[in-house]
């Protein structure tokens, strides 16, 4: 799917004001001509500290936590860090939480790269450093050479004058408004380009409004509404000029773990999201490397795990499903998440993938809390779902994931199943698919997106692994489905002919490659002393399957398609034969379109499906034409 960024808890304000009044008693005069002493009054006010003055001079809303506190006062955001948080590794990320026009931003979109920061005290300022994570120092080599560290120094990115210290705790208080409330190129909310158009945007600072402040155990969230004026320009003109849009933005600040996960070196034969690193060797030299992005899985009983017993992880991967989903969708979503457990069981882990509803009666649960990975429902007309995640920039450890499911993804399901399977599946011969088709197809979509959150990229070679004629075999398709991996854009069995009774029409509940990818990414090895030892074992695993098309990884090609065996929306190892079968089926579907789609469904729906048939036909033509100048690329 496409991937393509964005409760108040009031705390008692600190107020200390004590007035002491002392009246000096005067004695009454004995005689009227006596000199009367004037009555005097002495007022003594306890002097406030700079910290107290900063938080009491204006009406202040505060949220306090163990690692950070925020105070909103007079249109400013004050940040308070205790001593133990200074110098700690943290990340900052941005999520779009609302938008006035869905065409101007994707609700739930996260910036793809977290910014790794530290706050340190320098003289009379707090400096936010952007940490240089290009250099990786292995655990068995804790001290890097001075020369190496000097070549990978941190960047002093923002400086905040200290307003005060908390005398009782030693915490430092500073004004972070210049960073949080202003536009920043490291945290772009508005994309610079949309298709062939250049986007120009200007933030109206005076209209920015803080909407929420939340602090949790190890992360915090600052929400705000930002107002932009947007213009689009391109070679064909300017379709949008000075268009106002309001975008809700959540800034997340979270602590990174003190103990680093053991990273895993990449292999071009397994498709995973990557990060580039310079690895410091014992002799002081630098090796170029790429680490994969994955969750940290540790068995509760390591001895039992290496003895071959199924073990639960110390920290399972749990997804919380928003309660606004229709009941049918929730069933499919939960099932799709759990598909991956079968693959984890093969490598010794059980109950890794878990799923639950948003807790209704748990006051501690909050979807804005970074520690919860959530599946969110977006009631917009976007026909899509996506699975972004955030990772520790030091090691590639996935630390938070979100699956976004847009309402109109069901339209895509209706169209796919009609043009690809109506020739053989009577259930698909209608304007709208029945619940059974919606449910089984949505399961696949969710499992695909969960695969992305587990670290897996698209594998566009997987569908070409299956022999075309085998896609007409009930026995073969019941075992293998339509593809070797659900991370392909393989879709549904358009090769199956109307008389191929018993043929499976859907992708498998995990393909051969998916089981292999889980093993490669998450299997643990006894006696391993680090990522280099793991890499030796993993190379042997990949070598074992070298040359087997079911285990082949094909990188998704953007722009020009060079490799005809690694393209989207195709099935089978013979594109000419597969497309010929597909064209035969489209003729049959087109012939029956008026019969299957009644007048009660409306002419618009009939016209829409007619266009979908034409679009599918063009897919078949393209799948063949790519072979003419094509070359096969092997990772």
Task: Give names to the regions the model predicted.
Residues 391, 397-405, 443-454, 496-497, ...:
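Extended catalytic-interface subdomain
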Residues 33-325, 343, 352, 358-412, ...:
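Auxiliary tRNA-acceptor-end handling modules of aminoacyl-tRNA synthetases
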Residues 331-338, 342, 444, 615:
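Solvent-exposed, polar/charged alpha-helical surfaces in well-ordered, non-transmembrane soluble domains
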